[in-house]
């Protein structure tokens, strides 16, 4: 329960107005519809060791809006491709996440 509570706090720190301005209202609606999956996807990203998961979420929001199983599969495939230093590689070049779209 503590982990979920912390995640909800993090979710509240997300700048949804910025996301809406960049991606449009339909993306906000999609996040709302798939809220539980989006939260699980952010949680998985944090568990992988990404310290700036919220910033990555705000910049690459579209990759997080999918069923959790699909997200995990895509992320794991990308990690296998990048290798052991995947956190550093992705944090230094966020465009690597474009493969998840």
Where are these regions (language model features)?
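Long amphipathic alpha-helical repeat/alpha-solenoid cores
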Residues: 1-101
């Amino acid at each position: 329960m503590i982990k979920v509570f912390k995640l909800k706090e993090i979710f509240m720190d997300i700048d949804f107005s910025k996301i809406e301005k960049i991606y449009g209202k339909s993306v906000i609606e999609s996040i709302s519809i798939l809220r539980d999956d989006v939260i699980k996807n952010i949680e998985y990203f944090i568990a992988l060791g990404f310290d700036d998961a919220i910033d990555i979420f705000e910049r690459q929001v579209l990759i997080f809006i999918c069923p959790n199983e699909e997200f995990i599969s895509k992320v794991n495939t990308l990690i296998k491709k990048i290798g052991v230093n995947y956190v550093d590689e992705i944090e230094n070049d966020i465009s690597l996440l474009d493969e998840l779209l």
